[in-house]
């Protein structure tokens, strides 16, 4: 087993928090970044040790979380794998993997331009590459400390009644990319505080990791697969701002003698530079298979105008869209402001809104 002792430092009475690391593998820490959009520098040592009092920031409490393992370069993490999120810093546990198609326009831009794709509205054709994501549970103790940098601490579903606009959410459920996972081990039999942890996972010290799926988890995954499934991920970088979009089909409802199709989309904004920028505006174009084209403009996103800095480089949020057609496309731009008052536009990669063609009945909420 590799690694470094993971500790969490919570600032009493504030939302700022960090983790300090002590590693057994040279002076370089196993993980260099993490936390609520980015952490302060980590402490390292050539041998495993506990941090001395002089390393502790005044007013913060250190507590042992576990021991880091070497992140997997190949293969998948198993059900029950504990981890720290490398970008948002929360503790979590893997429930099961998803095999997604990643459409990376940054990779495509390095290849010769191909014929325009009408569905992509003038953009180059991008080939999808298989990439692993995971359905995870977030430790409830950490949710308050990431709420300023991530608005996706819950997965939303259509409600199980006739109101076509009613949604409900399962808090502490998230989707995580393979490279976001910093795996660790813990001797605690209940290391993650979430109401579904013990309902979904069983402690088995003979296994590695020592948490195995209960039949409840397998049944839940099977019944809700159409409404949980992550299939496509779209990514593009403009002027060192990377935008990642993940759309999810939520189902169809009947309203006023017509069908209304719903999608949820998750967006992560990442500042890959050290310059501070602030999101000011969004500009969406929404095309429906029925032939309509809608333009949506507004200030910020989800009521916020997040600042992306070297210390907190990422922001993530979810929103929803409905169409009176079974498919469509979305694309657009985010307008950012620099400290000198100048502005620049960042492209949102175009993505498809596809419904489940095999859907026989609309979802009736989450099945247990």
Swiss-Prot record:
Subcellular location(s) per record: Mitochondrion matrix; Nucleus
Q: Which UniProt keywords apply?
A: DNA damage, DNA repair, Mitochondrion, Nucleus, Phosphoprotein, Transit peptide
The transit peptide is at: 1-21
Which Pfam families does the record associate with it?
DUF525, YccV-like
Q: Which SMART domains does UniProt cross-reference here?
A: YccV-like
Q: Name one GO cellular component term.
A: cell-cell junction
What InterPro entries does the annotation carry? Answer: ApaG_domain, ApaG_sf, Hemimethylated_DNA-bd_dom, Hemimethylated_DNA-bd_sf
* Residues modified as Phosphothreonine: 292
* Lineage: superkingdom: Eukaryota
One GO BP = positive regulation of mitotic cell cycle
List residues of the ApaG domain: 235-360
MF GO annotations? DNA binding; protein-macromolecule adaptor activity
> Which purpose does this protein serve, as stated in its record?
Involved in DNA damage tolerance by regulating translesion synthesis (TLS) of templates carrying DNA damage lesions such as 8oxoG and abasic sites. May act by stimulating activity of DNA polymerases involved in TLS, such as PRIMPOL and polymerase delta (POLD1).
Q: How does it assemble?
A: Interacts with PCNA and POLD2. Interacts with SSBP1. Interacts with PRIMPOL; leading to enhance DNA polymerase activity of PRIMPOL. Interacts with POLH. Interacts with POLD1; leading to stimulate DNA polymerase activity of POLD1.
Please report the name of this protein according to its UniProt entry: Polymerase delta-interacting protein 2
